Each structure stands twice: as structure tokens, then as C-alpha cells.
Swiss-Prot record:
InterPro entries: LSm5 (IPR033871), LSM_dom_sf (IPR010920), Sm (IPR047575), Sm_dom_euk/arc (IPR001163)
The name this protein goes by in its record: LSM complex subunit lsm5
A GO cellular component annotation in the UniProt record: telomerase holoenzyme complex
Molecular functions (GO terms): poly(U) RNA binding; U2 snRNA binding
Protein purpose: Component of LSm protein complexes, which are involved in RNA processing and may function in a chaperone-like manner. Component of the cytoplasmic LSM1-LSM7 complex which is involved in mRNA degradation by activating the decapping step. The LSM1-LSM7 complex loads onto the 3'-end of single stranded RNA. Component of the nuclear LSM2-LSM8 complex, which is involved in spliceosome assembly. The LSM2-LSM8 complex plays a role in the biogenesis of the spliceosomal U4/U6-U5 tri-snRNP complex by accelerating prp24-mediated annealing of U4/U6 di-snRNA.
Pfam families (UniProt xref): LSM
Recorded family membership: Belongs to the snRNP Sm proteins family.
Subunit structure: Component of the heptameric LSM1-LSM7 complex that forms a seven-membered ring structure with a donut shape. The LSm subunits are arranged in the order lsm1, lsm2, lsm3, lsm6, lsm5, lsm7 and lsm4. Component of the heptameric LSM2-LSM8 complex that forms a seven-membered ring structure with a donut shape. The LSm subunits are arranged in the order lsm8, lsm2, lsm3, lsm6, lsm5, lsm7 and lsm4.
Amino acid sequence: MSMTILPLELIDKCIGSNLWVIMKSEREFAGTLVGFDDYVNIVLKDVTEYDTVTGVTEKHSEMLLNGNGMCMLIPGGKPE
């Protein structure tokens, strides 16, 4: 039998790991996943924010991202 994993279970397995978040806007975030809630609002630490239009990056120690604005979550962090 194949094993089924639910989306929130997969995100839960990523806590403490690097995560790359692509937003619906022109922003991307890469950091370590600290936690999340049922609405997939997430808390990241050691965050790098990327503006895909201007190419500008910013560093943040911690950040809360609204799950409603997310397009994609990619475990493993942003590729270099």
C-alpha cells in the first residue's frame, strides 16, 4: 500500500529546516522554518528576502508570513 501524507504533515516535517517561500507578489523568502498554524501562516528565522524585480536582498532575524500570500513552499531552501 502507498503511504499518504497530508500537506500540513509535510510542512510539520520541515520545522527546523531551510525553506524557500515564493509569494504571489514579486518577493521570495528563504530561512529556517520555526513554526506554522492551520492557515499556513509561517514563522521563519535567519531570513533572506529577495525582490525578484529589483534584485535587492534584505536580511531579517525573524519574520511572520501570511499564508494567504504564498504561492509555493519549497523544502531545502533557495538554490544558490
